[in-house]
Amino acid sequence: MEWAEWINQCFHIGNLTLPLVAITGFIMGLVITIQSYPSMAAFGAESWLPSVVSVSLVREIVPVITALICAGKIGSGIGAELGSMKVTEQIDAMEVSGTNPYNYLVVTRILATTLMVPMLVVISDTIALYGAYLGVNMKQDVSFSLYMHQIFQKLTFNDVLPSITKSFFFGFAIGAIGCYKGFITRNGTQGVGSAANSAVVLSTFVVFLIDLVAAQLADIFSIT
């Protein structure tokens, strides 16, 4: 295991995606709250707004949107980087020099995405809840302590567990697909662009597929 390269990839992924994930998380929390308020107010259920929005954000919206951002930023980057190394024969040169390209390039990137995507989801969840608090305060005068109390009345470990668990699978899939598309790149620079594009498309599809499977498993095992 190339630990130095793995740590480097973790920092690279964090620096590449954290600002976008943080901003998107805040906006998601704010927008979902603003859009949910009229429907809940129509039924006189405004007091349930923090609870409903927090569960929706943590269980479904934030993990999926964060994974899609990572698929676009990280998946395409890995596909393009390894594709470029493939067409310029840098990977062949690594094999000739005695370096295992799969350990150095593939394993480190897959493990980095598998670790970092859940961490980004947790960060985005936290920021999204602050965005939701701003949205609630635009409609109601609610103290932060009361807001947090209302959130954790309904938001439980059974909401957080499926979210974090499927995020590990999102990260693994994004890294594995990016590496696979990069390693099978052909046809020079045109192939590099195709590798990056196909990595994003396939990663996006797999993210939704994993999310569907996770939802079904949560329902089967009554993690609701």
Regions found by a protein language model. Name each.
Residues 1-16, 187, 221:
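N-terminal, non-cleaved signal-anchor transmembrane helix
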Residues 9-65, 69:
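Active-site cofactor/substrate anionic-group-binding motifs, chiefly glycine-
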Residues 15-27, 62-67, 115-124, 161, ...:
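Hydrophobic alpha-helical transmembrane segments of multipass membrane transporters and ion channels
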Residues 35-58, 126-168, 176-196, 218-224:
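Membrane-interfacial helix-loop-helix connectors in multipass membrane proteins
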Residues 49-92, 120, 177:
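Hydrophobic alpha-helical transmembrane segments of multi-pass membrane transport proteins
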Residues 82-107, 189-192:
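Short cytoplasmic-facing helical segments at TM-TM junctions of multi-pass membrane proteins
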Residues 100-121, 195, 199:
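Start (N-cap) of specific transmembrane helices in multi-pass transporter permeases
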Residues 196-214, 218-224:
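Helical hairpin unit composed of two closely spaced alpha helices linked by a short loop
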